[in-house]
């Protein structure tokens, strides 16, 4: 096509025409070669996953192999030339742009194809700044309204607020674009004018609701919906002052997920194969067929490129927000899908970007098996950047019928320590997986012509991703971060030229690219965290990098609030580590365990040496730097301000560190205890906000320590909460809460002691599991002998934990009570005599504990408190007299005898699998249970109050529902349990899974819900069902590991089913912490139900009813393996008792459930007699509800005490319980035993199993 224009020099017209043709040829060539590469990738996906193969958590090995083939492809190696050519054409276009603008309108439309196709090229390859430059040039030539909308979105995304203000004044929009303009204006005013934030927040919320309710289905409306949701996701990233204190912000997680969902819908309707929700691998993901028919349509190139880029950025941000908010399962799921989509797009930058994100996340997570994922991703990063990539020859982990050996690693345990731990070798977990030896990292050189060295100087965001890969490869060493810090300025300068072209003003010095800021911030946070974990001091290089990082992440504060807060707090901890160096907190020296065959007690003792005997470090390195008290007080004030202004947002990296740091350094016990509570359950509370789609101060957080104090003081006197928490420096702390006194806070143990505890404990569990699953050719007598040896070692190990891990602080786990007037007066005297050694709350606690502790232990515990501070030496000489006086005044107080008191443990994920309920101090004490979190406890108590229910809860065992062996592979268990179930009027299913609506109805309408099968029943009761249910029934999940919490990393809640039930407001959850044999757990359940519900049916009066915790305690004592079985079963929630019901009746045998054949897979729902109508909980007329104290009402020590077994409910606490990921289920081995049986024989019968394990029987040939 020949173009002439009188107003422009002919030579320039010819150059523009030639450039137009060259750009078209280059972009089409790029699209064709990319399409060839996409076809290769598509064939690899079909080979690895099949046409419709699932993408799940075990897909990383396959994705790593596909990535290595991608990096080795000839088509991939030729992509760099297009980057070089496009860069030259971009420069040429900028020299001719002025002439193109002066052409006639018709000619300008023709020349608009130049920036349009370059815009597509740069969007597709993730070079956003140049893409936006070309987009703005295209708008100047064509005046496309939809392109203007795209430009506004991208300018806001990149943080170019000054340029947005100019464009809003100069651009004219159609009526159809009014909402896009309005959303941008509202967001701009919200960012720049804090006094208008309330008004702008309301306007944005109204616009969001308007867009959501709009039924129009068009590309522009979906783009608007995604954009508005993304804007809303950032609105909570502001400090909450007086004006915003009561505002409801949009929740970040739910809104960024909505933005990603809308962007995915846009891609699915344009290029279906690139949609994250498209799992048909045969669907075309190639871009060329969609461009081939629109080669002359400049508008199409712009919008297809913008749509794909926006989709990638929304998906990436969604994954990062999930990490920030501790949504572990959603994080990994989103990242795996992102890598899959990136590979299908064949975009080098996107593949590297998603691989880096996965590698970064894998380096954070510390659960068993995560080291494999981390290494796979590091290998993939190096392979992508290598000039000579190697095919990853690794296979997917083998599927076996064996029980999953879920371990409980401690946070921060590195791969290098594996040989000194009791975890299985990596090869045991991965089958035939063979990992590559890592290659050396490919350096950038001018002489090299590979893809990496060619693209690095041309693409600033790619350069930042390259530096991130280097940091990941170097395990975030100081050398790699220093290199990144030095290189960042050069990367910024290269990218700044494009940003200046956006403004068309050479005097403008724009801020760094948001993507580069985020990447650098992420790397610095990981590096600082590792420095703190390794106790490294801060040198000059460290402080230089820290200060530079703080400056960089502050360029776009509302987008990087989480990073600003995290980097700031990590810097404070570098400056003031505030380590615990008390006498009982010495780190232990780790030694390799002895590998021994367990044939006798001596063997198990050799394999698991007594806890607490490891040598301890005698001298700790002291910080020689003088302590600046004045500076620290400023730091303390700054932290309080942050807690106050940003307390409404729950960002993991910041919150788990700042609040725990305040908890261990604050001198105010109420502030410290409040901070400890707020440092936990971050992911679960974010999940609650996500479901509610709003974020508000006080919604899932407590607004301050005054509010926390009110909640604690409103607790029943009979209830004590004990939190065992892991601090930011990984030390273990105990926090004790009771309504009558200030919180008690005691550092318990060094991190190395906690590692030793869980290391040895996990080994004992694994050893028992191996005996049960793989007994070999041994007699039944020998089988039980070996298991009893392990059980005996577990018993002594638990004793050792109390003695050496808790020490004298073990008594603090016992419940507290209200002091009488004389005892309270004595506590005040002791507090004053200590001269600062004992706080008043601690003095009250010690007076109360005097009757429960011997004099020596009592004095030792007081001296622990005094060591934490300073005290008068004479005070020690008064301790024997103080103990005698305390015992005397407590003997005058009959509260210990007349009231049953309850201890509820809130345990951090890393120590939650340990059987705390079986500590010797609880041997004669059945009233101990667990709570999911302090927040959930307050929420449960408030729910009881609002529903006018009495504590303990009264349960009608006849009004129950059961699911028995839904997988239909536990035939003997079915026979045993069906016979027992026939005694009751229960409804349920045997050998098949009920429908979701039946499960929801059962949880809502029944008093009790029983699951007897594998794990927690996630296969038949998925999270989606529990999310939509209101659980009024107590839930007994009698599967192995049903309530186990698998820890992941500091600040994460861990994987567990209990959070799903807690989210559904389940009042009580009973389940197993580890694998237990079938016969044993069946007998345990039968004994517990009989003892709590059946055996008490003839009693009258609520005080005479047997509590479930008492029945559980009794069942533990009767278990054949009192620790391996008895200690496995625990309860989360409030106490329950049996409701008075009519005696059991004989039922028509025709209506009883029958055991189905094990091989049958059809529905086995059985007809039952009509169930007892559900009876609502009512307040007993004979025992009135305890009045609730108001905020300003003081409690008198002499007020009337409540009757035994009746807890008073608290005042309203506006908190909600949380949700998190399901723990992986574990198969079990079940023991066959008749329903009514004589004493357990010494020789077991043949056993069925949930896996391939079988207990030896007498019929076996030995």
Curated annotation (Swiss-Prot):
Entry's Gene Ontology molecular function annotations: cysteine-type endopeptidase activity
GO cellular component: cell cortex; centrosome; chromosome; cleavage furrow; condensed nuclear chromosome; cortical granule; cytoplasm; meiotic spindle
Keyword DNA damage: no
Tissue: Expressed in oocytes. Expressed in male germline. Expressed in spermatocytes but undetectable in spermatids (at protein level).
Residue ranges of the region described as Disordered: 1147-1262
Top-level taxonomic group: Eukaryota
Effect of residue 232 to Y: In ax521; embryos are arrested at the one-cell stage. No extrusion of polar bodies. Multiple rounds of DNA replication occur without cytokinesis
Primary site of residence: cytoplasm
Full protein name: Separin homolog sep-1
Organism: Caenorhabditis elegans
Record lineage: Eukaryota, Metazoa, Ecdysozoa, Nematoda, Chromadorea
